Amino acid sequence: MRAGEAILAALLVASCPVAGANQPAPGPVEIDAHAEGTAFPHFWEQAFGSGRAILALRASYREDLRELKKVADFRYVRFHAILHDEVGVYDEDSHGSPVYNFSYVDQIYDGLLENGVRPFVEISFMPKKLAARQDVHPFWYRQVVAPPKDYAKWDGLIHAFAAHLVERYGIDEVAQWYFEVWNEPNIDFWTGEPKQASYFELYDHTARTLKAVNPRLRVGGPATAAADWVSPFLAHVAQEDVPADFVSTHGYADDTVQNLFHTAEDIPLDERVCRAIGKVHAEIQRSARPALPLMWTEWNVPSFGERYHARDTTYVGAALAEDIYQCDGLVDVMSYWTFDDVFEENGVVREPFSGGFGTIAAGGIKK
């Protein structure tokens, strides 16, 4: 059963009256089969997030990906840390000259493509030898979140990375990928100062370098948490004539109203994601580039706190259906975070059903 069919079935079951309840008398239902239809693209199953890049080499990761692919016609997977030192992309020799190694990158992306999905490339994080400082994020895998010490070397890395992908997979293939610059630079995933201006500098270098490799490569940002920085980002790329092929940002039902909307308004948890999407959609429409697609590259349903593990329950299906209904027409892609619980932001998963983000629990158990 496809995801869309499953959602429809869930809605139909939910709409059935409880046995014994007062039911209205049956009556005719008229449907105008000649009425003008409206397209309903499956924006919610085009992309999924996952645990960080290196985990894509695991057999359990790939098996879970294949299982989800059977029921959801998703085309892209997005994950953090393709430039983490554990992937081995960047080093420097004794003279300080860059040394590149794309062996693990090839194995990671080959594994996705062999299973019928493409990378939604998140360009992160900073290789230690390229970092201005050794600022690390508190995730278990301790990624470096500082700016580069030398933008010439950063540009060289991005150019070599993109050129290698084009050489290996061909421009007709890689032109169908997306390249998103960094992850949530407005919070503790980026320690540049001033925070926004320094991120824009990183974005400008990265976007222009990608386009120098081939103008068909698609790049975007600002990849922020809580739907932030979109208007300043759009103003910046327009004013400075920086390439941007899409807008990306994140928003979760568990994000606070203050963070999402900068207001004290009382907004229910189950309305926050699509209200935030509507806000960003309007910001794009008001910008100098109103036709840019909106990629919501992280979201999930309310967790209701760690003690309830709501994301391990059948509640998720109904919550997803409600979000799809609310968000229709406002967004091009929503990338659910994540497709499975092969995921180690807080350490190695000890047991299934521990409240993880994924649709498949540890051990390949379908939620």
Predicted regions and their residues:
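Bacterial N-terminal signal peptides
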Residues: G4-S15
